Amino acid sequence: MDTAGKVIKCKAAVLWGTNQPFSIEDIEVAPPKAKEVRVKILATGICGTDDHVIKGTMVSKFPVIVGHEAVGIVESVGEEVTTVRPGDKVIPLFLPQCRECNPCRNPEGNLCIRSDLTGRGVLADGTTRFTCKGKPVQHFMNTSTFTEYTVLDESSVAKIDAEAPPEKACLIGCGFSTGYGAAVKTAKVSPGSTCAVFGLGGVGLSVVMGCKAAGASRIIGIDINKDKFQKALDVGATECINPRDFTKPISEVLSDMTGNTVQYTFEVIGRLETMVDALSSCHMNYGTSVVVGAPPSAKMLSYDPMLLFTGRTWKGCVFGGWKSRDDVPKLVTEFLEKKFDLGQLITHTLPFHNISEGFELLYSGQSIRTVLTF
């Protein structure tokens, strides 16, 4: 492309501090350096993790460009890039896969050491490619997709099928893959089992879809927003409950409902209290509980160790346990083969400049997933 090797001026949604609104700014995006890729974003989803930065519950430096769930087209590549080329359709990866570190080389690992889940805010060489009003702007989780153009390390880019529709396939960059994988890959839900899913947002519904795909016979959705129940039933939940409708602890409610046979529970909210509730709700001898929701930074969890001593398994899950560069293209292929329907998760599609409206839909509970298009 004729922009290769040049600074690109474009629009981006910049956060200048916590609890501040997005500001649509003119920014400059530098050319990619060695082993880097510059991508033109086509569509990007709004995820609750982005809101953690706004609220200050996830550590970040400012100013920053958040967003991490997207599909784009490679505009140009730096030296030594071998896996993608200009014109390729790609998904940015908030969880990279360098294929060299211990977690990448271990068949059970996926948390690459190049991951930036702690707010470092720069690329692998320690610098940023974004500038706004003469100031450097931080990257977010190796991605930064709330911008017309972004720069990523090659290890944070997965080439996908050119036929994949960006406004749907972008969900594979985070929300869908995280939830679906939590059920089929991390928990390894068994056929005929009973599952309980705490939180019925986009990721929680993806967990429900994964439980159904794995053959669970009973899938109980749990949320304080009853407006989400019908969508949960549509994607595979067998019943839904609101904890506020009961005076008993939710673990006792689930035990009464199922005869104490809940084998798998999933916390998809990111609240410390519900993490313990989910653990308490699975069977004490053979139950597995998976933490899927991103926890708040610098918070400590307190729980009764007897919950684990009696035989429960407590697991964490980042990006559904998938190895990103290897598995994302496969998930896109499965989507194109209609093995799952991403359209069920999308409630709103808005132009990028309406990003603030998209977050208001999230806050009000009206949206499952809002996708921004460019």
UniProtKB/Swiss-Prot annotation:
PROSITE patterns: ADH_ZINC. Keywords: Acetylation, Cytoplasm, Lipid metabolism, Metal-binding, NAD, Oxidoreductase, Zinc. The keyword Cytoplasm applies. Zn(2+) 1 binds at C47, H68, C174. GO terms for cellular component: cytosol. Belongs to the zinc-containing alcohol dehydrogenase family. Class-IV subfamily. This is All-trans-retinol dehydrogenase [NAD(+)] ADH7. The lineage of its organism: Eukaryota, Metazoa, Chordata, Craniata, Vertebrata. The gene is Adh7.
